[in-house]
Structures are given as structure tokens and as C-alpha cells.
């Protein structure tokens, strides 16, 4: 198997978890418009 694909998948799922947690936190969301979509 390709270790790079596994690492990329792990990183993507970590980012999803970060985004979910961060974007529900207004101060974090404001500081990370690139992952939270900005707009507010």
C-alpha cells in the first residue's frame, strides 16, 4: 500500500475535525476564514 495516501487521508480527516470544532467557535472561525468559509 502507499503510505503517502494514508497520510494524506489522515491529514484530511484531521482538518475536517478541526474545521468542525473551530467553525463552531466564533473566535476560531474568525481567525480561520479559509477553513470556515468566511462570509460572516
Curated annotation (Swiss-Prot):
It comes from Conus quercinus. This is Alpha-conotoxin-like Qc1.4a. The modification Cysteine amide is found at residue 36. Pfam families: Toxin_8. Alpha-conotoxins act on postsynaptic membranes, they bind to the nicotinic acetylcholine receptors (nAChR) and thus inhibit them. Disulfide bonds join 22-28, 23-36. GO terms for cellular component: extracellular region; host cell postsynaptic membrane. GO terms for molecular function: acetylcholine receptor inhibitor activity; ion channel regulator activity; toxin activity. Residues 1-19, 37-40 form a propeptide. Expressed by the venom duct.
Amino acid at each position: 500500500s502507499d503510505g503517502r495516501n494514508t497520510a494524506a487521508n489522515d491529514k484530511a480527516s484531521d482538518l475536517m475535525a478541526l474545521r468542525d470544532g473551530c467553525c463552531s467557535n466564533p473566535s476560531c472561525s474568525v481567525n480561520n476564514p479559509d477553513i470556515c468559509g468566511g462570509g460572516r
